[in-house]
Amino acid sequence: GLAGVAEGLRHLFKTIRQGDYVAILAWLDENEAVRSLLESCRAHIGGALGVPVTLGFGPRYLHSTGQLHKGGSSAGVFLQFTAGGRADVAIPGHDYSFADLHSAQSDADLAVLSDLGRRAARVNLGEDPAQGLIEFVSILEGALAT
């Protein structure tokens, strides 16, 4: 479940100052339901905190905004979403799958952000990302209201 997430969000959001931005880093299968729920998160965060909020899907964002996240100023606050239950395919000639590769990439991205002293948190949405995001939006609304 998402127990403990509200407290973590409140702690993370208390660090945000004018000039900062929030980056939603979604390591999820991109579909209409997931995108719509993430856009809702984006609107809630931006509206409540008065800072820009970006949304990127991994691993694609690593080749564009991912460079900005790691270089330059430390104005970014990063909220990484992961989930279990991804469709998986073996990579021919290798002893790992695409899900393994995806997981390693998201782990590495979070580790680098942390190593650079960036403010970052991960939320694992469980086996059903859309349902997890529905629960998360409710938790987010509560965290932003306090």
Name these PLM-found stretches.
Residues 1-146:
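Phosphate-moiety recognition in structured ligand-binding domains
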